[in-house]
Curated annotation (Swiss-Prot):
Residues 1-22 form the signal peptide. SMART domains: VWA. It holds the Pfam family VWA_2. Zn(2+) binds at H156, H160, D167. It comes from Mus musculus (Mouse). The record marks R698, A699 as: Cleavage. Expressed in the non-goblet intestinal cells. High levels in intestine and stomach, and lower levels in eye, liver and spleen. Increasing expression from the duodenum to the ilium, and decreasing expression to the colon. Isoform 2 is expressed in intestine and stomach but at lower levels than isoform 1. This is Calcium-activated chloride channel regulator 4A. It is a single-pass membrane protein. PANTHER family: CALCIUM-ACTIVATED CHLORIDE CHANNEL REGULATOR, CALCIUM-ACTIVATED CHLORIDE CHANNEL REGULATOR 4. The chain crosses the membrane at residues 884-904. GO terms for biological process: chloride transport; proteolysis.
Length: 924
């Protein structure tokens, strides 16, 4: 039965439209509330970190208030403290705060020795980022010389996080040819003054020299750096170098530097940072304050053991599609392998009414796990009352003498319940976190709102058992606050429908970062299959434990499993047999973080025809893994699956190339309702490696300052090159990305409503008299297929091209045949009507058009300078420009003085000689 769509539902729907942003931040009367700063479990205990966090945020709040013209400040902040740190009377238990929802993470650096503060940002302009990453040394103030005051750095990163702006410097293009025909440092605003120099240190000594010009680029050489003057008067911009004392503002339209090749210009279409911030929802829902705000309020929350209640549906519909048995298989997997030791777990069954079948018990060994396994349901009947089950879970917590704050409810249901919306407010106010697993196509949508409102997970498992969705969903519910080295990670999840004597064969890789508690799980629907498992040395393992009643077999590898390729072969013994296999393992060494994959979509709810964006992040610790092979499987609630190859190429849906985030558009909607996401990642063909590049969206490193005309350099930061990146051993991972809901999908064939994706990586270079262009090909439908044609236009004015693309001069592209999506495109043309006298810039943009005449819109704008810019004059050489240098003037003055002295001296001598001659004659 469908529930009525009253005011409560509409309010919740509006909340959902915020997207899949995991942050719990709210803006309330100009103040940001519910900010979470989490200290990583890998950080050794040091309570001074907490005090430094408080000081940093307090200073940042004042700075933010002034920088935003008295609009925003930090109102209250929760600091999450690791469970491994000693308890204190001032620490409280978290409610819905968790590491998953952290806005700022204090964690080890991405690469040892590099403490650069950055924001994990893999979305587009104006879109919120993931989190800010500070290292302990940075928070403790040990990197102030390199990055400046930590409070000002926090405001720089907050702008990335909250408003989706980007940096206004560019270390890949630190200099550019300005319209003044001079070489300028990439910055905003141009009012920031400084000196360009090469600063090199070796063997404890450092030397400095002038920058030379590169003969190819006509710009300064690679090692040239811009050293800002310590004393400045310019106030902008925070997104360039917030460490400058005078800088207190974001660049505005009036002082924005559109010429500079900054990432912000490229991503935000040459708008200033303040223009972007001014269009944000935060800005539009606030007005400047008349008084100064109070300092931030801090809550200290220490992670503690999990308190969870399983709330399992035993209504009559659970007898369909083998749902009851499949739920029990997945629950056994969760209770035996996923839930952590020291957790408190209880269990409730519900249909028309709810029954407490097990009070809270702390898991310390297999004894407690087995006690819980004995209480799994064996029969199902009756209706569905979800609120009854949730209220029974609250009673379980109360019976265990726990408040509901921070407790977790794992709710599984397959049915609709018109009364489910009645307890939404109670659930939200409880402080409990609801994780919802929707089983089948009819599970109630109101409960989806519960999970999102409480910060829980939302999963979908269809009735297509071969897709293994139910086991994947339970397996994804490990603690969000546990150390990653203690979590059970999924290496394999696969299934198939097979006839008698047919096989499910494949391999799974156990890499050196894993191997502890390795677990193989096989399930079937009719009769136990023949199971063959061989380790990397070829030794066969046959000692699986058979659980015929639950139709599952499992094997735990003692100690640390062998590194390498494990081979499995499963032989079906019945026709139309459904077999699945799941493999999990934990980190082999607590000091070496394992490779992980995390998956998500850009929004929890969507309306046709808006596309979804699928993301998969592959990391080792905080270090991105690039060059991996990543695929996503999207399953509708009817069981239909679509597979996408995710890309890290910086084109289409992917915002940044080689950042360890693999992305793709998804538009292949088939039905209304829920869809689930599952991602698989492996090492590819010996191509995966750790990225040692500096992360994007970070505070600028200060190479030094110009003080009283002298450069005072900082120690050069640690650098690495592409050549030093090691190729990784092969690995395999799978991960559940949760569920999303799509509405308004029409029945029947879908019309062509999807244009090509916008080109975002257009680059232009001047090659003799020709301009060469490169870009990544879009597709007929976003990043799939092939476009019909490209339209290339140019202009001498960047804003004219941006705002009036269709009326700008068009380049002849008769001989340009589009390639398949995600291919590299190249094209060269000779610009017309350009003379040496008026040569400045040419700006170029591309629009792609598909067979239905749908266009992508103009690309990012590339530019080419048609002149050789002037470098800073060298005092050792004659200047090439007109005018007289200071040295020339000085030499001229000295020469004139010498000449005057010679003339005066000669005159005196002549006069003396005349006097001598006259005296002799008179005397005579």
């Amino acid at each position: 039965m469908a529930f009525s769509r009253g005011p409560v539902f509409l309010l919740l729907l509006l909340y959902l439209l915020w997207g899949s942003d995991t942050s719990l931040i709210r803006l309330n009367e100009n103040g940001y509330e519910d900010i979470i700063i989490a200290i990583d479990p890998a950080v050794p205990e040091d309570t001074t970190i907490i005090e430094h966090i408080k000081g940093m945020v307090t200073k940042a709040s004042t700075y933010l208030f002034e920088a935003t013209e008295k609009r925003f400040f930090f109102k209250n902040v929760s600091i999450l403290i690791p469970e491994s740190w000693k308890d204190s009377p001032q620490y409280r238990r978290p409610k819905q705060e968790s590491y998953k929802h952290a806005d700022i993470k204090v964690a080890p650096p991405t690469v040892e020795g590099r403490d650069e503060p950055y924001t994990r940002q893999f979305t587009q302009c104006e879109e919120k980022a993931e989190y800010i990453h500070f290292t302990p040394d940075f928070v403790l103030g040990r990197k102030q010389d390199e990055y400046g005051d930590s409070g000002k750095v926090l405001v720089h990163e907050w702008a990335h996080l909250r408003w989706g702006v980007f940096d206004e410097y560019n270390e890949d293009q630190p200099f550019y040819s300005a319209s003044s025909k001079k070489i300028e440092a990439t910055r905003c605003s141009t009012g920031i003054t400084g000196t360009n120099r090469v600063y090199a240190c070796q063997g404890g000594s450092c030397a400095m020299r002038r920058c030379r010009t590169n003969s190819t680029t006509k710009l300064y050489e690679k090692d040239c750096q811009f050293f800002p003057d310590k004393v400045q008067s310019e106030k902008a911009s925070i997104m360039f170098m917030q460490s400058i004392d005078s800088v207190t503002e974001f660049c505005k339209k009036e002082n924005h530097n559109r010429e500079a090749p900054t990432l912000h210009n490229k991503k935000c279409n040459y708008r200033s940072t303040w223009e972007v911030i001014s269009t944000s929802e935060d800005f539009n829902s606030s007005t400047p304050m008349e008084t100064s705000p109070s300092p931030p309020f801090f809550s200290l929350l220490r992670i503690s053991e999990r308190i969870m209640c399983l709330v399992l549906d035993v209504s009559g519909s659970m007898t369909s599609y083998d749902r009851l048995n499949r739920m029990n298989q997945a629950a056994k997997y969760f209770l035996s392998q996923i839930i952590e030791n020291r957790s408190w777990v209880g269990m409730v069954h519900f249909s028309s009414q709810a029954t407490i079948v097990h009070e809270l018990i702390q898991i310390n060994s297999d004894i407690e796990r087995n006690q819980l396994l004995q209480t799994l349901p064996t029969s199902a009947n009756g209706g569905t009352s979800i609120c009854s089950g949730i209220k029974a879970a609250f009673q379980v917590f109360k019976n265990g003498e726990y408040q509901t704050d921070g407790t977790e409810i794992l709710l599984l249901s397959d049915g609709e319940d018109s009364t489910a919306k009645d307890c939404i407010d109670e659930v939200k106010d409880s402080g409990s976190i609801v994780h919802f697993i929707a089983l089948g196509p009819l599970a109630d949508l109101a409960v989806t709102n519960m999970s999102i409102l409480t910060g829980g997970n939302h999963k979908l498992a269809t009735d297509e058992a071969q897709n293994n969705g139910l086991i994947d969903a339970f397996g994804a519910l490990a603690s969000e606050n546990a150390d990653i080295t203690q979590k059970s990670l999924q290496l394999e999840s696969k299934g198939a429908i097979l006839n008698n004597s047919l096989w499910l064969n494949d391999t799974v890789v156990i890499d050196s970062t894993l191997g502890r508690d390795t677990f193989f799980l096989v399930t079937w629907s009719k009769q136990a299959p023949a199971i063959y498992l061989r380790d990397p040395k070829g030794t066969q393992t046959t000692n699986f434990t058979m659980d015929s009643a639950s139709k599952m077999a499992y094997l735990s590898i003692p100690g640390t499993a062998q590194v390498g390729v494990w081979t499995y072969n499963l032989e079906a013994k019945e026709n139309s047999e459904i077999l699945t296999i799941t493999v999990t393992s934990r980190a082999a060494n607590s000091s070496v973080p394992p490779i992980t994959v995390n998956a998500k979509v850009n929004t929890d709810t969507n309306t046709f025809p808006s596309p979804m964006i699928v993301y998969a992040e592959v990391l080792q610790g905080y270090t991105p893994i690039i060059g991996a092979r990543v695929t996503a499987t999207i399953e509708s609630n009817s069981g239909k699956t679509e597979e996408l190859v995710l890309l890290d190429n910086g084109a289409g849906a992917d915002a940044f190339k080689d950042d360890g985030v693999y992305s793709r558009f998804f538009t292949a909607y088939s039905v209304n309702g829920r869809y689930s996401l599952k991602v698989r990642a492996d090492g590819g063909r010996n191509s995966a490696r750790r990225s040692l590049r500096h992360p994007s969206s970070r505070a600028a490193y200060i190479p030094g300052w110009v003080v009283d005309g002298e450069i005072q350099g900082n120690p050069p930061r640690p650098e690495t090159t592409e050549a030093t990146q090691p190729v990784l051993e092969n690995f395999s991972r799978t991960a559940s990305g949760g569920a999303f809901v799509v509405s308004n999908v029409p029945s029947g064939p879908l019309p062509d409503l999807y244009p090509p994706n916008q080109i975002t990586d257009l680059q232009a270079t001047l090659d003799g008299e020709e301009i060469s262009l490169t870009w990544t090909a879009p597709g007929d439908d976003y990043d799939v297929g092939r476009v019909q044609q490209y339209i290339i236009r140019t202009s001498k004015n960047i804003i004219e091209l941006r705002d009036n693309f269709n009326n700008s001069p068009r380049v002849d592209t008769t001989n340009l045949t589009p390639k398949e999506a995600n291919s590299e495109e190249t094209f060269a043309f000779k610009p017309e009507n350009i003379t040496e006298e008026n040569a400045t810039y040419i700006f170029i943009a591309i629009e792609s058009v598909d067979k239905s005449s749908l266009s992508s819109g103009p690309s990012n704008i590339a530019q080419v300078a048609l002149f050789t810019p002037q470098a800073e004059p060298d005092p050792d050489e004659s200047p090439s420009s007109s005018g007289v240098s200071v040295a020339t003037i000085v030499l001229s003055v000295l020469g004139a003085l010498v000449l005057v002295c010679i003339i005066v001296g000669t005159t005196i001598c002549i006069l003396k000689n005349k006097r001598s001659s006259s005296a002799a004659i008179t005397k005579f």
